């Protein structure tokens, strides 16, 4: 028998009592802890990035960093670490953060490092991902080349009527609220955070799907068509599921993804394909002369149908569906949130707001909303927008990773396949590039000889350290359209209404998930008409 031998008795003793007189599970725990301690020691002292400063404890556990990420407060944590360690630090050994302007331009523009895999987790399928979520540089290059004409100056002008129509509905709703008030000149409260989010989605509905989502109308009219009323919630759920799946790898392939947002958007894309194919079949050789709706969806549908079947890079209907949904992700709350934050900054700086009002002529509430090509030159408004984008970038960081080869950043060798994030927020608040970085100071974006700079001259902005739309080949392709939208909405609002603060500054908090957003989805302002209502 085995137990009668010396070896057999030893095995039996280990089974019964464990090694060193301890239970087996306790020995396994000790072994795990020792192994973890060794890995932490190796990461902290022996890794190729060991000379880069950073929190020591994160080499043994990333739980604190994960806690901040899950709560959406990692941006604040990263800011504090940049203040402590400077323009370059590491979280553990595989995550680097950099806030130096030259280093960021090196990573984003010169080397054009690929995005981290977190972006791919946001896509429905990485094989058909759009420009925002793809991590494949070659695929992105081909899609960028395809999409660029749809965001060129001339094409953007063709989209102006859709932008005007959606904006008109918002300000008609505001006008109706004023008319219903018992005292038109008693301040009314507008939750601009949600109002502007609805406006941005309506604009994207018009330009990317050919219909208005009618979200603005749903806020004031109980009888409005509410078919798309939940699209913001469905989009948020879609993104939330993608983020969760990223942290559950490799089991993410067994997790079901919420794709209900596609149930709303796919029929719109399919209908446009059917219309275009039928129109082309009926028109024959004269198809090019048939009038069509000139929007982004039509551009993509035409491009898809015109691509040769034998091409290696195809633009299928699935590609178009995914790209249109990604336009909602990248162009929705990014613009609307920025407008809200600019209003917040102006209300916290009454002298700047008063100065801005001096440059904008008042308008009646029932005037037609001017298109962005009809707006007058507004240098001080432009400076206020730029300063707002500096202080409130749409994302606190841009995640990239090194490829198969190492790269050198600020004299440090970064090994292959290491995540390295460009800290845009830390860059925009660096006293190295910005005098009084915590001060809202629009004059820094004006020429020194500008009449608007005379009363409060500021050091000139360092435009190389100003990256609200990113930089390099993967910068925001819709930056011109977003700029026009911000100017148009802000000019119309301030021309018609006098705004005043309602929210206490210390009660407004932020979260960073996909974009920089308010912790509580509400920012109210008080408004009164600048001109008397017509009888």
Swiss-Prot record:
Identify its membrane topology class.
Answer: Single-pass membrane protein
Glycosylated residues, chain numbering: 3
Q: In which pathway does it act?
A: Secondary metabolite biosynthesis
Q: Which UniProt keywords apply?
A: Glycoprotein, Heme, Iron, Membrane, Metal-binding, Monooxygenase, Oxidoreductase, Transmembrane, Transmembrane helix
Which coarse location class applies to the principal site listed for this UniProt protein? membrane
Query: What EC class is this?
Result: oxidoreductase
Q: Where does heme bind?
A: 476
Residue spans crossing the bilayer: 19-41
- What PROSITE patterns would the database entry show? CYTOCHROME_P450 (PS00086)
A single Gene Ontology MF term assigned here is: monooxygenase activity
State the similarity comment. Answer: Belongs to the cytochrome P450 family.
Q: What does this protein do?
A: Cytochrome P450 monooxygenase; part of the gene cluster that mediates the biosynthesis of the glycolipid biosurfactant ustilagic acid (UA). UA is a secreted cellobiose glycolipid that is toxic for many microorganisms and confers biocontrol activity to U.maydis. UA consists of 15,16-dihydroxypalmitic or 2,15,16-trihydroxypalmitic acid, which is O-glycosidically linked to cellobiose at its terminal hydroxyl group. In addition, the cellobiose moiety is acetylated and acylated with a short-chain hydroxy fatty acid.
The name this protein carries in UniProt is Cytochrome P450 monooxygenase cayp2
- Which organism is this entry from? Mycosarcoma maydis (Corn smut fungus)
